[in-house]
């Protein structure tokens, strides 16, 4: 019987190979219906690796061009052009975890480090670079993005030591990118073929700017007098100037393919990075499951190898349930404003000043001498009033607009000042004032055409002026940089919000960080951001959770340098439990509307750039925690075993596995779902002492939401040595039925440390998709 049991899967495998061979013979060398990813679990399994290689050899012997990527370092599998029938057959093969169409992902598109320094009253990594922050370890940050512009001064390697000997990566050459473009700062550069791109020319050089911006935010060398044509002038520097950069170019102007992202994860694991930073993700509506999400799959195997994976939360806010990249082994980052504002005010007749926001470089008069008109009053004959109010494309009459400043409104929620500007400019207008409560706090660059954004409260004054004045006039003032702007931080309107569609029992996002109007390196030849008659700017100011994630990646890199033996979950815990919840007005962090931010907006709070270096206690989420999560989520042991590199020999899914038990994995935040208010719920957490060599005592305090009782036992944790682990229980009960999600926190503290965990309690079921 044992022999039959052993050979049955293998015979089935051979049978399927025969079918595939016949399918391949019929298909010949033609292209398949589409690109599919075949995920076969951990590369540590010899059986999986052999099956993958046999399958590749059989299928693509005469179709080499259809095989796009093979995955063999951190996990097994491949990406290839297949027919739908071939994909179905492969999906039934023993050892195959999933087969799915290659998905497309989108990008989530200086002073910010000084703001974090001010907020936490600590020194950010701003001194001269050395070989390592603590003299013993160089951290290597892998970045999956659009490439890098190596000539930028932000990537000079002055005073940096030799490349770490453990580095196994490479610097791939192209026509415009030579091995000499890599140095002791940029130590690795790889590019990946996009199956949708027929071009034969590939390079790691950044032609978009996004990857260079992200890279310099993380690890850029200090560059004095950096600015965007004089705006945001100062010293541009990365948060971890000692870190090394390894660029994995997975995105081009057409987007980022999942097959390339997985290939980059596979290479990065083999190359030896310490941190992986991804400022990209799926759209909020995609609702991708774990075993068909290349980012979740790649991150799972990276974390198994001790690599922390940090991802942007997405730019689909402010609606709830829009956060992406929410697997529990990923650190998910929201975006907030900083204490710098770019004002471009509107001056009305009578010199009444209306505050506005925008970056432009116009030379219009500072006196209000230009006629002012509302978009609806300038509508073309064929346009609707609503379209004209928004200054939508082809909605305005050129004769009515010429020489005037036009007031436009975001009436549909999907239009932006840049599109209104283009319409006004094309019809001969002098300037554009755009009304939008959401984007008012996020400065965008509008080139040389006068454009500014105001909110509805400010717009009411302009409407009153228009209605009471026969010949209304106005002007738009040049951009002025305002420092020490208050209140800051505030969660950016675009930042995707929780709860996670994956599970409410894991709070997402994890943290928030600066992501609004961030100055960083750019490509050196981008005419689209250049001013007429001036050379291309080497730096650019942009916003997005794309800009927030690299701030966290930089701090994670610093922590890794100071604590090289810490694993990914310890670093994540250090960042989350030391986050701040207050702004520079000493009030609580708010959203773009002024409402107090909840953990669904900001996670544990705003990144603290150096308090996280010494957190006192950490929550270590173990491999078993993640395996149990997969059990609770509904995966069977066979699938989990195929996925895991370090699958314990005696591991089995708990007999009572269910979604509610996800709350029990050792995460730095506490999410309790499916709680209607009846009875009580208990979760357990374990903390590790990393702050003291000797004795340490911590006392708990609880921020309890109204209508609830939260009991923590024990109320004191007494550690006797460094590295000691202690466990506590949190028992939640309610005095009334739960009608909406509520928020609280618990903090373990002593005279030296405060270790805070947010708490979210929901009546909704754990899984919402």
From Swiss-Prot:
- Could you tell me which residue ranges the Peptidase S8 domain spans? 112-613
Q: What happens when the gene is disrupted?
A: Increased stomata number at elevated CO(2) concentration and increased number of epidermal cells.
A Gene Ontology BP annotation from the UniProt entry: negative regulation of defense response to bacterium
Q: Which residues form the active site?
A: 145 (charge relay system), 210 (charge relay system), 546 (charge relay system)
Q: Which SUPFAM superfamilies match?
A: Subtilisin-like
Q: Which UniProt keywords apply?
A: Cell wall, Hydrolase, Protease, Secreted, Serine protease, Signal
Pfam families from the entry?
A: fn3_6 (PF17766), Inhibitor_I9 (PF05922), Peptidase_S8 (PF00082)
Q: In which tissues is it expressed?
A: Expressed in roots, guard cells and meristemoid and pavement cells.
What EC class is this? hydrolase
> Inhibitor I9 domain spans which residues?
35-108
Q: Which residues form the PA domain?
A: 381-465
Localization of this protein: Secreted, Cell wall
Identify the stretch annotated as signal peptide in this record: 1-27
Q: Supply the EC number(s).
A: 3.4.14.10
Its induction note reads: Induced by high CO(2).
- GO MF terms on file? serine-type endopeptidase activity; serine-type peptidase activity; tripeptidyl-peptidase activity
Q: Which family does it belong to?
A: Belongs to the peptidase S8 family.
The task this protein performs is described as: Mediates CO(2)-controlled stomatal development by cleaving peptide EPF2 (AC Q8LC53). Not active on peptides EPF1 (AC Q8S8I4) or stomagen (AC Q9SV72).
Q: What is this protein called?
A: CO(2)-response secreted protease
């Amino acid at each position: 019987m044992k022999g039959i049991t052993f050979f049955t899967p293998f015979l089935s495998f051979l049978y399927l190979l025969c079918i595939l061979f016949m399918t391949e013979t019929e298909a010949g060398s033609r292209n398949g219906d589409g690109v599919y990813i075949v995920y076969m679990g951990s590369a540590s399994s010899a059986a999986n690796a052999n099956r993958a290689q046999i399958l590749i050899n059989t299928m693509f012997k005469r179709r080499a061009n259809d095989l796009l990527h093979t995955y063999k370092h951190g996990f097994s599998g491949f990406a290839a052009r297949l027919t739908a029938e071939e994909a179905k057959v492969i999906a039934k093969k023993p050892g195959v975890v999933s087969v799915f169409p290659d998905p497309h992902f989108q990008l989530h598109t200086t002073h910010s480090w000084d703001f974090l320094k001010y907020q936490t009253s600590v020194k950010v990594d701003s001194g001269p670079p050395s070989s390592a922050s603590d003299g013993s370890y160089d951290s290597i940050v892998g970045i999956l993005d659009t490439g890098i512009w190596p000539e930028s001064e932000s990537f000079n390697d002055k005073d940096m030591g030799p490349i770490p000997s453990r580095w196994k990566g490479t610097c791939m050459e192209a026509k415009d990118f030579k091995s000499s473009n890599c140095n002791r700062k940029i130590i690795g550069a790889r590019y990946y073929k996009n199956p949708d791109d027929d071009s034969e020319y590939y390079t790691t050089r950044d032609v978009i700017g996004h990857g260079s911006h992200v890279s310099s935010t993380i690890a850029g060398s200090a560059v004095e007098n950096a600015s965007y044509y004089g705006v945001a002038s100062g010293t541009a520097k990365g948060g971890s100037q000692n870190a090394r950069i390894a660029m994995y170019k997975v995105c081009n102007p057409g987007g980022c393919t999942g097959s390339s992202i997985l290939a980059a994860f596979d290479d990065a694991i083999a190359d030896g990075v310490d941190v992986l930073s991804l400022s990209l993700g799926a759209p909020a509506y995609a609702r991708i499951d774990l075993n068909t999400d290349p980012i979740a799959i790649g991150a799972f195997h990276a974390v198994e190898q001790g690599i922390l994976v940090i991802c942007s939360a997405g730019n689909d806010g402010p609606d709830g349930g829009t956060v992406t990249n929410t697997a529990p082994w990923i650190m998910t980052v929201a975006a907030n404003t900083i204490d710098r504002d770019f004002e471009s005010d509107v001056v009305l007749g009578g010199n009444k000043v209306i505050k506005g926001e925008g970056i432009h470089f116009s030379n219009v008069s500072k006196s209000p001498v230009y006629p002012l008109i509302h978009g609806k009053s300038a509508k073309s004959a064929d346009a609707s009033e609503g379209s004209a109010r928004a200054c939508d494309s082809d909605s305005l009459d050129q004769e009515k607009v010429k020489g005037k400043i036009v007031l436009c409104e975001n009436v549909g929620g999907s239009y932006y000042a840049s599109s209104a500007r283009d319409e006004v400019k094309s019809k001969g207008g002098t300037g554009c004032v755009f009304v939008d409560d959401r984007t008012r706090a996020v400065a965008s660059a509008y080139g040389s055409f006068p454009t500014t954004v105001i909110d509805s409260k400010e717009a009411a004054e302009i409407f009153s002026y228009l209605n009471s004045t026969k010949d209304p006039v106005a002007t738009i003032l040049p951009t002025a940089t305002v420092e020490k702007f208050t209140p800051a931080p505030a969660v950016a309107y675009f930042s995707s919000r929780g709860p996670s569609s994956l599970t409410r029992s894991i709070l997402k996002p994890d943290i928030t960080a600066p992501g609004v109007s961030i100055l960083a390196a750019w490509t050196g030849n981008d005419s689209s951001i250049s001013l007429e008659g001036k050379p291309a700017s080497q730096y650019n100011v942009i916003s997005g959770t794309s800009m927030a994630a690299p701030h966290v990646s930089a701090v994670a890199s610093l922590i890794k340098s100071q604590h090289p033996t810490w694993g990914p979950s310890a670093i994540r815990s250090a960042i989350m439990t030391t986050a701040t919840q207050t702004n520079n007005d000493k009030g609580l962090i708010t959203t773009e509307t002024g409402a107090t931010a909840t953990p669904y907006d900001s996670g544990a709070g705003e990144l603290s750039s150096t308090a996280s270096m010494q957190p006192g206690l950490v929550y270590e989420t173990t491999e078993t925690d993640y395996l149990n999560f997969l059990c609770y989520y509904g995966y069977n042991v066979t699938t989990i075993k195929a996925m895991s590199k370090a699958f314990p020999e005696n591991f089995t899914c708990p007999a009572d596995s269910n979604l509610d038990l996800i709350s029990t994995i050792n995460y730095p935040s506490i999410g309790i779902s499916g709680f209607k208010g009846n009875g009580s719920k208990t979760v357990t957490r374990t903390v590790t002492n990393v702050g003291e060599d000797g004795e340490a005592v911590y006392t708990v305090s609880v921020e309890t939401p109204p209508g609830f009782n939260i009991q923590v036992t024990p109320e004191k944790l007494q550690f006797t040595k460094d590295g000691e682990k202690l466990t506590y229980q949190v028992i939640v009960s309610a005095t009334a039925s739960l009608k909406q999600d509520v928020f609280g926190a618990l903090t373990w503290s002593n005279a030296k440390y405060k270790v805070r965990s947010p708490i979210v309690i929901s009546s909704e079921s754990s899984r919402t998709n």
